[in-house]
Amino acid sequence: MGNEKYQQGKTKNCLQYYILPQKEFGEKMAAIVVKRGANHIFWKDKYGENIAFSAGTAHFIEHKLFQQEWGDAFTAFSQNGASANAFTDGDKTVYYFTCRDKFVENLHLLLDFVQNPYFTEKDTEQEKSIIQSEISMYADDPAWTVYGQMLEMMYENHPVCNAVAGTAETVEKVTAEALQKAYEAYYTTEHMVLICTGDVPVKQIRMAAEKVQRHQSDMRVYFPMEKKEILEKYREKEMGLSCPCFQIGFKFQPVPKEKWLQTRIAMGFLLEILAGESSSFFQMAYERNLLDEPLGMAFFCGEGYAFAAFSGIGEQPEETAELLAQELKYLQKNGLPQEDFSRIRKKMLGRFLRRMDSPVSLCMGQIEWAMMEKTAADVLYCIKTLPMAAAEKLLQNAFCKDTMILSVVK
């Protein structure tokens, strides 16, 4: 990762930071991670009273923070030769920039606008139509539709079943006052992380981080109780596609935070063995003309939820799902092949090491690892040392046909 040793720590005002110098690169990147996202809509105040923000509130704040009283932060970054952006998902909101020059100036700009919201009723009302247009665009996308439909079939109460941007109706309910209240709950310093990669000035970064003021809140997030069972096994929606797209999902029990890293890596091994390009499942699916290419595979876990998803395009989604279930049953009966496990370990190590090859990919990786309070070294060690028994245990205990879902868009 470069000649200078990485640094991690916490400022006197509780801002966590990871500085990952890469002296061989001209490109630099910085990100502020707020460990609050679309799933964090249910809160209790200091008196124990329940407060619920509208679905899509975290995403709305992300849009609005770039609009400052002094002007547009995007424009300011551009004038400094930087490219800035942001994104929100269920668990976090991330603001970042990349540049080659004026890194410190851009870092100060990033830290400044994230700490200083400027919400007015006029600007909030104007933003609603922009976000509602974005929601409408996603609603017309079959891939987003089939994924969202899968989550609705899995979860009844947990906000993970909501679209990150909310709906046109929930966005309409947002007010400047509600945004300010949500900002004060979400953007506490102890839930924020600064990450810097590339040929960056470590001392100046630490000085800038120490100047970040402490923000605290007496509000506490909570998640409604969610039953173990799924709500539906099969649902399809008609969108006039020439070939159906589908998501095969498995709902799991929530994973304790201290086990997130090992579970994610163990699940990575499992998904590759079960349905990767070299798997028996894909070879059979290809020979039977069920699939032309391997399924997309992903595992997600966070506060109060965990699930795996397999995405694909094919004329016979139900037959594909049944074949996957049969392969899963076979592996549960016969165990994971040692050869496959060793091969995938090498593949995952290669993929991980390639991530070190650019400031952007390393920063994006550390964004995910910071959510688990881990570093690249922790991830590398886990990939190298994960015992096959850990993946076997997941195989036997997590996957169950009773919590298997098929979401289809035709």
Question: What is each PLM-predicted segment?
Answer:
Residues E24, A86-G90, C161-A163, E184-E190, ...:
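Short, flexible turn/loop "capping" segments at secondary-structure junctions
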Residues M219-P224, E293-A298, N334-R343:
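Flexible, glycine/charged-enriched surface loops at secondary-structure junctions
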Residues Q247-P254, I273-G314:
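A structural supersecondary motif
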Residues L107-L110, L194, I205-E210, T320-L328, ...:
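PAPS/PAP-binding and catalytic site of the sulfotransferase fold
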Residues E69-A182, D292, E322-K329, L336-A376, ...:
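Acidic/histidine-enriched segments that form metal/cofactor-coordinating
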Residues M1-A73, Q180-M284, T403-K410:
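His/Glu-rich zincin catalytic helix
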Residues Y47, K64, V94-T98, Y118, ...:
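Second-shell loop/turn segments in exported
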Residues C99-V104, G198-K203, I313-E318:
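Helix N-cap motif at beta-to-alpha junctions
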